[in-house]
Amino acid sequence: MAKPSSRSALYRLIEAGQLAHKAVLLPLVEKGLEPGDDAILFELARSGTTEADLAAELGMTRDALAGRLDRLADRDLITRQAVGPLLEPGIALTERGTRIRNALAEHWAQIEEALMGELKPKSRKKFSRALARFVELLRL
């Protein structure tokens, strides 16, 4: 059995994960947002949605989501409006919410590029598949 080492791939993966997590959180904190708010903004960027659909997509209860949505609405990042072809009551990004979402997405893309920038497209796909497989193994 291999002895844990700071030079091992697993050690470096853990270290990179912790540092990437901090890097992703930085613009959230700077904008007064909480971890997880970015997931809501990213999901709403596709188009407006109902609270029930958003909660299901994020794997949250509607009650857990409600407080977050109230806070984001108070900060003028989302608005409650009719959405979809049936004009159901729902939520969508405001102009301010869209700007913040775009800034967060750009920051995310920069971190992704720092991770994958030296890899060719084929190697990027292979690396992503290997990480996905590893995550699935750990979830078992």
Indicate where each model-derived feature is located:
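Short, locally clustered residues in the helix-turn-helix/winged-helix DNA-binding domain
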Residues: 14, 42-46, 105, 132
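A structural signal for well-ordered alpha-helices, especially hydrophobic packing surfaces
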Residues: 17, 101, 135-138
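Charged, amphipathic alpha-helical coiled-coil/dimerization segments
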Residues: 70-132
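Recognition helices and adjacent regulatory flanks at domain boundaries
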Residues: 6-7, 14, 23, 60, ...
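N-terminal helix-turn-helix DNA-binding core of bacterial DNA-binding proteins
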Residues: 11, 22-64
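Long, contiguous secondary-structure blocks with strong helical propensity
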Residues: 55-75, 126, 136, 140
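N-terminal leader segment of winged-helix/HTH proteins
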Residues: 1-31, 75-77, 92, 99
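C-terminal regulatory/oligomerization modules of transcriptional regulators
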Residues: 1-3, 49, 122-140
